[in-house]
Amino acid sequence: MSTINTDTNETMPHISVNAQYIKDLSLENPSAPSSLAALDQRPQIDLSLDINITNLSEESFYEVELNIEAIARNEKYKLFQVELKYAGVFNLINIDSEQHPVLLSVHCPAMIFPFARKIIASCTQDAGFQPLMIDPIDFGALYHKKMSEHQN
């Protein structure tokens, strides 16, 4: 049997997820029921994603919010539009503040994204469509792209 030394764990750098929650969720199915009969071809999906980071206190507590919008269209109809604001509260424990931006922009969103993805898939399925399975997102690449845009 192994034991865990909690004294060491308390001083180790780590990220604690204190909460995860839906802040806002909207699904529009504007052309139903006609749009549900016109599902013989794969719709065009326009997807946008944004990340908002809010410092919640002088300590290292942050809210990381994913804003995801997906619009599905075919030749005739706007099939659906789903908007989700999904957030998590993170505590960055014993982590140098210089590392906070990359952790909050890359690692924290990656931790909560699978939950947001599942919510969107469930909503679109409940609206009568195939579940929208958003491809995995490379938050590291998004962060580096954003940093290079700020430098230019």
Swiss-Prot record:
Alphabetical keyword list: Chaperone, Cytoplasm, Protein transport, Translocation, Transport
Look up keyword Cytoplasm and say if it applies: yes
Question: What GO terms fall under cellular component here?
Answer: cytoplasm
Protein's UniProt keywords contain Transport: yes
Name a GO molecular-function annotation.
unfolded protein binding
Q: Which residues cross the membrane?
A: none
Question: What biological-process GO terms show up in the record?
Answer: protein folding; protein tetramerization; protein transport
Pfam families recorded for this chain?
SecB
List localization entries: Cytoplasm
Assembly and oligomerization: Homotetramer, a dimer of dimers. One homotetramer interacts with 1 SecA dimer.
The role this protein plays is: One of the proteins required for the normal export of preproteins out of the cell cytoplasm. It is a molecular chaperone that binds to a subset of precursor proteins, maintaining them in a translocation-competent state. It also specifically binds to its receptor SecA.
Q: Which family does it belong to?
A: Belongs to the SecB family.
Name it: Protein-export protein SecB
